[in-house]
């Protein structure tokens, strides 16, 4: 299973920090001309005395530079999600500020005042408690005609409700289900969102971000139990009927020993080799004077003798050669 690549937040800091104040983006604002981003308060104060970008010196606007900057909500959400505790601390700072200055609180939105309801929260902290529901995944409900779910009145699926930290992984949830339901290790447990299996390294925070959970109810999860995969041993291929050499993929017990030579079965020649009194038949019916000796085509002379150049050379044990 391929895991996601984890990198340190310090490696992303150049893309998440404002060059004017040296901190993480708060109310990220981007210049339209060059797409460089800064904190809203930082870039507004800077453009009061300059009409050029602080990074690349591109002219923002000739007379009114504030017309060419835009609020970047996407970038701000990324910063809040990547930096732990930043959103929570920023909302607390805003509430404390507007508590001391109640007159200014009427002009801003709820997020500007730091008063964000649970339904409007887009950021989830690591230590936050998430409510979730988990139930058995019934495949039969999805097998209805024309993709419609079957309404089963006989069987009612029981939901279980849990409160878990946002940093808890799917693997921990699987172990919890296995221990509570006494599921043997020979069976596999899959945790799912709707009909899609979830990775073991997903946290509840990841699931909420990926599937855009809006906090309008418990995080709906499902599970199913499957029998474990059995390891099947592949049988090695048999030797051919001709008694040829065994294939390399077959394990040979004699080859595993360092001092035992590998034995190769030689083909039987009792039925295939002709006897000395049997005349050699030609493999060329159109040319009966051509025959084959030891696989080599040889010509026979007028007197029925094989020429000297076509005779077979035999080697004896003492190294002396003789002609057949």
Curated annotation (Swiss-Prot):
Keywords: Chromatin regulator, Metal-binding, Nucleus, Repressor, Transcription, Transcription regulation, Zinc, Zinc-finger. InterPro entries: RAWUL, Znf_RING, Znf_RING/FYVE/PHD, Znf_RING_CS. The keyword Iron-sulfur does not apply. It comes from the Eukaryota. One of its GO terms (biological process) is negative regulation of gene expression, epigenetic. It holds the Pfam family RAWUL. GO terms for molecular function: promoter-specific chromatin binding; zinc ion binding. Residues 256-279 have a biased composition (Low complexity). The keyword Nucleus applies. Residues 232-324 are annotated as: Disordered. Residues 280-295, 303-324 have a biased composition (Polar residues). It is found in: Nucleus. A zinc finger (RING-type) spans 18-57. One of its GO terms (cellular component) is PRC1 complex. A motif (Nuclear localization signal) lies at residues 81-95. Component of a PRC1-like complex. Homodimer. Interacts with cbx2. Component of a Polycomb group (PcG) multiprotein PRC1-like complex, a complex class required to maintain the transcriptionally repressive state of many genes, including Hox genes, throughout development. PcG PRC1 complex acts via chromatin remodeling and modification of histones; it mediates monoubiquitination of histone H2A 'Lys-119', rendering chromatin heritably changed in its expressibility. In the PRC1 complex, it is required to stimulate the E3 ubiquitin-protein ligase activity of rnf2. This is Polycomb complex protein BMI-1-B. It comes from Danio rerio (Zebrafish).
């Amino acid at each position: 299973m391929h895991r996601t690549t984890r990198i340190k937040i310090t490696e992303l800091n150049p893309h998440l920090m404002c060059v004017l104040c040296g901190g993480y983006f708060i109310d990220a604002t981007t210049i339209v001309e060059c797409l460089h981003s800064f904190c809203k308060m930082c870039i507004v104060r800077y453009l009061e005395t300059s009409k050029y970008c602080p990074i690349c010196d591109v002219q923002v606007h000739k007379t009114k530079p504030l017309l060419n900057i835009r609020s970047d909500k996407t970038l701000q959400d990324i910063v809040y999600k990547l930096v732990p505790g930043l959103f929570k601390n920023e909302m607390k700072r805003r509430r404390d500020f507007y508590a001391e200055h109640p007159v200014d609180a009427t002009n801003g939105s709820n997020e500007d005042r730091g008063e964000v309801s649970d339904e409007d929260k887009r950021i989830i902290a690591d230590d936050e408690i998430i409510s979730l529901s988990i139930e058995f995944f019934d495949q039969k409900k999805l097998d209805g005609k024309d993709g419609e779910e079957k309404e089963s009145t006989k069987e009612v699926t029981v939901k279980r409700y849990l409160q878990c930290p946002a940093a808890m992984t799917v693997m921990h949830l699987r172990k919890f289900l296995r221990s509570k339901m006494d599921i043997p290790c020979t069976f596999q447990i899959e945790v799912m969102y709707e009909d899609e299996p979830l990775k073991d390294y997903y946290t509840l925070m990841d699931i909420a971000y990926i599937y855009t959970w809006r906090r309008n109810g418990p995080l709906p999860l499902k599970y199913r139990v499957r029998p474990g995969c059995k390891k099947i041993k592949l049988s090695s291929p048999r030797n051919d009927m001709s008694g040829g050499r065994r294939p390399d993929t077959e394990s040979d017990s004699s080859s595993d020993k360092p001092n035992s030579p590998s034995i190769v079965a030689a083909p039987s020649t009792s039925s295939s080799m002709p006897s000395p009194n049997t005349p050699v038949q030609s493999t060329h019916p159109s040319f009966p004077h051509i025959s084959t000796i030891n696989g080599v085509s040889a010509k026979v002379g007028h007197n029925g003798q094989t020429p000297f150049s076509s005779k077979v050379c035999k080697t004896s044990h003492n190294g002396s050669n003789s002609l057949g």
